Amino acid sequence: YYTPEYKTKDTDILAAFRMTPQPGVPAEEAGAAVAAESSTGTWTTVWTDGLTSLDRYKGRCYDIEPVAGEENQYIAYVAYPLDLFEEGSVTNMLTSIVGNVFGFKALRALRLEDLRIPPAYSKTFMGPPHGIQVERDKLNKYGRPLLGCTIKPKLGLSAKNYGRAVYECLRGGLDFTKDDENVNSQPFMRWRDRFLFVAEALFKSQAETGEIKGHYLNATAGTCEEMMKRAVFARELGAPIVMHDYLTGGFTANTSLAFYCRDNGLLLHIHRAMHAVIDRQRNHGIHFRVLAKALRMSGGDHIHAGTVVGKLEGEREVTLGFVDLLRDDYIEKDRSRGIYFTQDWVSMPGVFPVASGGIHVWHMPALTEIFGDDSVLQFGGGTLGHPWGNAPGAVANRVALEACVQARNEGRD
């Protein structure tokens, strides 16, 4: 399984693993073990191996490089033949590549840093229900980032008070408000009541401002059937957008919801709750850029992508690396930004990155510069924390945003 002479094919799925072998285990052996365990291998030779062509189906570790500045850490590059994966299934792709290998005895730690998805595979996915351009056309909003706000306190408000908070924010000039990721259907606010009061807030604020407004109605639920029921109800109310927690809800549920949203003209906002459990450790887990690529394939029109400046962790260059992987069509390999492979999405629609978490108006110049126009800037406490209330907080955000955009367009600081 360690084959340094192997030339990768255009149809191979390529993976870059950061591996820390146990003391005494050579890097080549560890790399081969990763390739074997995540493809056709098992711990011993079995007679049924003779009934198939392992050469055709096995994963191959084709390169290993030591990580600069780290002791006993290596980047192992593994190529997987396309036929190992079911078409159009992120679930199957991740089950194969990261399903079993992370508990391996020969490794002290293992992290999936990046994946190269070949066009032959990405073309089997629908991708985002609508994408950046279609969303702008639906909302009739151009030439600036979109503004959002998560309604706080995230838990405990009644549906009517919740709807009022939504109305105040949208009236003040925001484009979107948002259910917090853990607002589903709790005793203090059942989902149907929330959807009804929020729809009222949407239409009232639209009538007043003459702008199209949205609220990310969280359709995440305990079963896929219940999730779809909520999405259907949101569509019947005339809401423009629903929301899903894609890691806790799962990729299968997410892809089903994305198909429904595309067929029925709903935008889909994706929250990444639970991502830090998977991506925060530097030497073990899965890097968020892989989770972001997986989401673009599974389907979503917005996804949270860190802020570079707020309360949550995120390094600037690396964050911009996966922001580009979400938005752009073709992304060159660039190790300084953590991009291990050139990725060609062959015209799959892009995803709006959402900057959210501890940001406020003072961050606006930095945010517009870092994220550019195709992004959603989401201020929770940064809107609702305004001493005069939600609507003035929303006004402050909108004014700050338009000032920054105007300054940029006129070439002023």
From Swiss-Prot:
InterPro entries: RuBisCO (IPR033966), RuBisCo_large_chain_AS (IPR020878), RuBisCO_lsu_C (IPR000685), RuBisCO_lsu_C_sf (IPR036376), RuBisCO_lsu_fd_N (IPR017443), RuBisCO_lsu_N_sf (IPR036422)
Annotated positions of the N6-carboxylysine modification: 178
Leading EC class: lyase
Record-marked site positions (Transition state stabilizer): 311
Gene this protein is translated from: rbcL
Protein EC: 4.1.1.39
UniProt KW keywords: Calvin cycle, Carbon dioxide fixation, Chloroplast, Disulfide bond, Lyase, Magnesium, Metal-binding, Monooxygenase, Oxidoreductase, Photorespiration, Photosynthesis, Plastid
Subunit comment: Heterohexadecamer of 8 large chains and 8 small chains; disulfide-linked. The disulfide link is formed within the large subunit homodimers.
Cofactor note: Binds 1 Mg(2+) ion per subunit.
PTM characteristics: The disulfide bond which can form in the large chain dimeric partners within the hexadecamer appears to be associated with oxidative stress and protein turnover.
Binding sites annotated in the UniProt record for Mg(2+): 178, 180-181
Protein name, entry field: Ribulose bisphosphate carboxylase large chain
